[in-house]
Amino acid sequence: MASKPGDFDAVRKDIVSLLDQPEYDDGSAGPVLVRLAWHSAGTYDKSTDTGGSNGAGMRYEAEGGDPANAGLQNARQFLEPVKARHPWITYADLRTLAGVVAVRAMGGPEIPWRAGRTDFADDSRVPPRGRLPDATQGAAHVRDIFYRMGFDDREIVALSGAHSLGRCHPANSGFEGKWVNNPTRFSNQYFRLLLSEDWREKTVAGTGLKQFVAVDEVTGDELMMLPTDLSLTSDPVFARWVKVYRDDQDLFFADFAKVFDKLMELGIKRDAEGKVINKENVEGGYVSAPKKQGKIASKL
């Protein structure tokens, strides 16, 4: 039975109920939902005030088919039953709320979230491709991408802590493996591992991309880091915050909650009462996500 419009608690409960996915990566949809929320907002450009979390642009090929969003068709499909039960919620609200709920359900901080996003009526407002981070790059690229969105160095490192969740797949990003031992539990282990392990270069079979790996002596797990991850330790300003978050998980959680909230609000204009006033959008209807599959792929 459909919920009453505005019953976001009911939506939250349904999101939590779908996180357990035994046939999917590490048995959880949580990490890919966080990635979906992140990529939905990470297209923002403050200089042109374009992109951001409004519009649900991944419903269109121009954004949904971006190679940087490969694999996110699974996240979008996970959320379709929730959308069906709560047809009043926009895709833009649902996809950002799902990321916030997933972080909390996986042991992370409570992140503020505000409703009111609308869905693009067509693809004319979809931002251009190329705005998401290129993991093969270094600190200069990381700053270019995140400064464009309006983040500072501390916020960049805090947001990078989301790599405590999930794993990479060669067919999606060209990289392979997980960052931490338990990729479905939000923690500061990402920062601890960045500084404690002897990371050695490895070429990913089939893609030729360079990443860095280390073997956990206790569990035998092979863990990995991306070039952009290691740039956080080679750059002195970034490295300072890596050390801070390594030593203080509570501070990391507090900072992450603030900066993820900021990320989810990129591109959103609100009036004094908090109502979204982006004039170029309407309450959009359903548009099938590009490359939508009949069955969710567990190994990509």
Swiss-Prot record:
Which InterPro entries does the UniProt record give? Ccp1-like, Haem_peroxidase, Haem_peroxidase_sf, Peroxidase_I, Peroxidases_AS, Peroxidases_heam-ligand_BS
**Which cofactors does the annotated protein need, by name?**
heme b
Q: Which UniProt keywords apply?
A: Heme, Iron, Metal-binding, Oxidoreductase, Peroxidase
Query: Catalytic center at which residues?
Result: 39, 179
From start to end residue, where is composition biased (Basic and acidic residues)? Answer: 116-126
Ranges in a coiled coil: none
Which residues are noted in the entry as heme b-binding?
163
Family membership, please give it: Belongs to the peroxidase family. Cytochrome c peroxidase subfamily.
Protein name as annotated: Putative heme-binding peroxidase
Identify the species of origin: Pyricularia oryzae (strain 70-15 / ATCC MYA-4617 / FGSC 8958)
Traced from the root, the source organism's taxonomic lineage reads: Eukaryota, Fungi, Dikarya, Ascomycota, Pezizomycotina
